[in-house]
């Protein structure tokens, strides 16, 4: 979350998240939903499907951030918001 805030995003962690969205972030009218994984943990098919549903229902970008260690983060976009919709 610190990296988001350092780049001008408003960000909040979902308390004790056991759902698809761990972090909600917003900046300049854009919304980003993030599922966070670390180590060997992987997002399940069901978690990915739910994260995508969240992205679609809120017209938000949805990503999985996988912390690999030593500060390395692999980011994978699973849904892209439709820009200029409406």
Where are these regions (language model features)?
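Acidic-basic catalytic patches of nuclease active cores, encompassing PD-(D/E)XK
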Residues: 1-14
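Conserved catalytic cores of phosphodiester-cleaving nucleases, focusing on short active-site segments
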Residues: 4, 23-40
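Short acidic/glycine-enriched loop/turn segments that link adjacent beta-strands
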Residues: 17-20
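Nucleic-acid-binding surface
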Residues: 2, 39-49
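Alpha-helix C-cap/termination motif
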Residues: 7, 26, 57-58
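Short coil/turn segments at beta-strand junctions that form active-site/ligand-binding loops
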Residues: 9, 30, 60
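Structural signal for conserved beta-strand scaffold positions within catalytic alpha/beta enzyme cores
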Residues: 13, 35, 64-66
């Amino acid at each position: 979350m610190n990296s988001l805030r350092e780049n001008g995003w408003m960000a909040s962690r979902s308390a004790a998240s056991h759902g698809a969205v761990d972090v909600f972030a917003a900046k300049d009218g854009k919304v980003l939903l993030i599922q966070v994984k670390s180590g060997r943990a992987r997002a399940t098919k069901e978690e990915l499907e739910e994260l995508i549903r969240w992205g679609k229902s809120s017209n938000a970008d949805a990503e999985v951030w996988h912390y690999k260690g030593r500060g390395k983060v692999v980011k994978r976009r699973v849904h892209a918001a439709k820009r200029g919709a409406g």
